[in-house]
């Protein structure tokens, strides 16, 4: 069963929530958080932020409380989070803040556990996340300029920010909540220099109701002054192994009386498909945090717990396109599965020595129980080409966004003229992984990661059906390449010794990442097929617990369990 686009659907249930009593900030109690000379002030007293970055989108909601408790037991006093625009507004004007997307519920859980919140609402977040958190449908406007004063981009950003304000503005510490700081944009100096744009985003954040707590902007030590606004707190991002004094040298010169903070201290690094797992030395990480604490420098550990980038939400790097994998373990102190690692205990030992006055660091919460499910086989199959959705006609090739599709797979179909053996099929460009079929026979695969865009064809008769099946693997999340449209972005040509011919008159079929779409297929008993297909099975559990699904013998595709898209296989 090593074919592509195989999809497993199963039946499984989820778990329990561990409970641990919390401390201040207590819900309903109002506080003041402000900027003092060389320090942050909480109710007028010096306060060092020790933040753990975790993402509500990368942790099942049933586990939120446990992971927050793990951060508190690590010795942290704050949780740092992004707000991911594209998961909350998957279609223009349709906002979702329920269930897994209930960011306010996540913040309230943190407050229940005695943790403050640093909020980073973007609009751009990077985070190895699809398009850096920006919604795909922005790319339907062909001339849009993302992260600029483009009128449409600003209009949509303000609408989103207002919705975030409706959810979270009343959770500022001055109003009885636990939000102590709010970020404006994200590492913009790595993208452009445009203080007017940053000012517009700042104003959008304020207009959304975030007027009570300090606003800050983060960047690298080499770029923080490019877009620095006088009324914002400036913070620096860097990682394990950095020289602390060198990182803050320019900031201290520019603002000698300002509090210092590393808003992203990278505990590890992210992983790409096809590469080795990244790690960073625990001792070096702990040493860097000690250096900051000895200097009364606040920090946010990115990541304290990375979790999993479920479904299609992983991003990619460019140039030399490289997609992020589903695991966002990040070599963080808390593993992807939520377990305390040796790095966790080494850092906990340090932070215990730097506990806040009156802070009681609780015991480390127990991990969720593991269960084992006996091996099972796939019982039903539905061939993809026998289960096509209704097509859309298009004279020319267009990317999937122009067919109102954001993610998943798209099929471009046309008929060929007579083709001589050795003719080259040129696809410009494949975003991101394609299979080429002639009358259902696989002729080749193309991988954007390897710069592949041609298939040499055998002799083919006029009227042969050409199918190009393209899978989107994640939009670029960093730098100017975030304008990353999917499918085939330009044209398809036949190149032979007699010249070039652009292919036209396409039938286009969209396969969204949607369980209702996957479920509604003509399944029949069977195991493996030659070609792309949907696969389905069911199994029963005698007990619930964490379990790992081993897909090593499978190929490319996605997995759904109880209608939830858990992982992207590549």
Predicted regions and their residues:
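N-terminal carbohydrate-binding accessory modules
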Residues: 23-78
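Aromatic-lined substrate-binding rim segments of carbohydrate-active enzymes
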Residues: 66-129
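Aromatic-lined ligand-binding clefts that engage carbohydrates, nucleic acids, or primary amines
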Residues: 422-437, 539-562
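Catalytic-core region of carbohydrate-active enzymes that cleave or remodel glycosidic bonds
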Residues: 241-333, 339
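Aromatic- and acidic-residue-enriched segments that line the glycan-binding/catalytic groove
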Residues: 93-99, 123-147, 198, 233-234, ...
């Amino acid at each position: 069963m090593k074919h592509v686009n195989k999809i497993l659907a199963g039946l499984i249930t989820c778990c329990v929530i561990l409970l641990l009593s919390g401390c201040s900030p207590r819900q309903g109690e109002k506080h003041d958080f402000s900027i003092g000379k060389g320090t942050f002030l909480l109710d007028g007293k010096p306060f060092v932020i020790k933040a753990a970055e975790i993402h509500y989108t990368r942790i099942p909601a049933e586990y939120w409380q446990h992971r927050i408790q793990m951060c508190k037991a690590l010795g942290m006093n704050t949780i740092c989070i992004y707000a991911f625009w594209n998961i909350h507004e998957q279609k223009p004007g349709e906002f979702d803040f329920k269930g897994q997307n209930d960011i306010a519920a996540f913040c309230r859980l943190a407050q229940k556990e005695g943790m403050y919140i640093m909020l980073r609402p973007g609009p751009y977040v990077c985070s190895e996340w699809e398009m850096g958190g920006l919604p795909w449908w922005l790319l339907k406007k062909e001339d849009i300029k993302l992260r600029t004063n483009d009128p449409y981009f600003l209009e949509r950003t303000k609408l989103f920010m207002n919705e975030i304000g409706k959810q979270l503005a009343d959770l500022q510490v001055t109003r009885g909540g636990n939000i102590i700081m709010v970020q404006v944009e994200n590492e913009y100096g790595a993208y452009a220099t445009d203080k007017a744009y940053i000012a517009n985003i700042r104003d959008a954040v304020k207009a959304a109701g975030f007027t009570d707590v300090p606003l800050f902007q983060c960047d690298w030590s080499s770029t923080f002054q490019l877009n620095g606004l006088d009324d914002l707190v400036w913070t620096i991002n860097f990682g394990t192994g950095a020289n602390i004094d060198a990182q803050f040298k320019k900031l201290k010169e520019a603002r000698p009386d300002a509090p210092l903070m590393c808003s992203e201290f990278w505990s590890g690094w992210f992983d790409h498909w096809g590469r080795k797992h990244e790690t960073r030395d625990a001792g070096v990480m702990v040493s860097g945090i000690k250096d900051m604490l000895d200097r009364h420098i606040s920090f946010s550990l990115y990541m304290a717990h990375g979790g999993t980038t479920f479904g299609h939400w992983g991003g990619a790097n460019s140039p030399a396109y490289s997609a992020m994998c589903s695991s966002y373990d990040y070599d963080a102190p808390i593993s992807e599965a939520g377990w305390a690692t040796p790095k966790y205990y080494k850092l906990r030992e340090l932070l215990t020595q730097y506990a806040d006055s009156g802070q009681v660091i609780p015991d480390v919460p127990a991990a969720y129980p593991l269960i084992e499910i006996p091996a099972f086989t796939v019982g039903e199959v539905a061939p993809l080409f026998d289960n096509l959705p209704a097509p859309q006609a298009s004279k020319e090739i267009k990317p999937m966004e122009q067919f109102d599709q954001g993610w998943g797979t798209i099929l471009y179909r046309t008929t060929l003229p007579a083709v001589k053996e050795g003719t080259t099929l040129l696809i410009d460009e494949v975003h991101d992984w394609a299979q080429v079929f002639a009358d259902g026979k696989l002729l080749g695969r193309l991988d954007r990661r390897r710069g592949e865009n041609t298939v040499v064809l055998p002799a083919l008769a006029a009227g042969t059906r050409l199918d190009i099946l393209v899978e989107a693997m994640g939009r670029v999340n960093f730098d100017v390449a975030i304008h990353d449209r999917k499918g085939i972005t330009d044209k398809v040509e036949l190149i032979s010794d007699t010249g070039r011919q652009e292919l036209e008159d396409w039938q286009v079929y969209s396969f969204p990442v949607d369980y209702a779409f996957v479920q509604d297929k003509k399944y029949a008993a069977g195991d493996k097929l030659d070609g792309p297909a949907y696969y389905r099975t069911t199994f029963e559990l005698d007990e619930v617990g964490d379990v790992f699904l081993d897909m090593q013998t499978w190929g490319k595709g996605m997995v759904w369990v109880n209608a939830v898209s858990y992982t992207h296989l590549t």
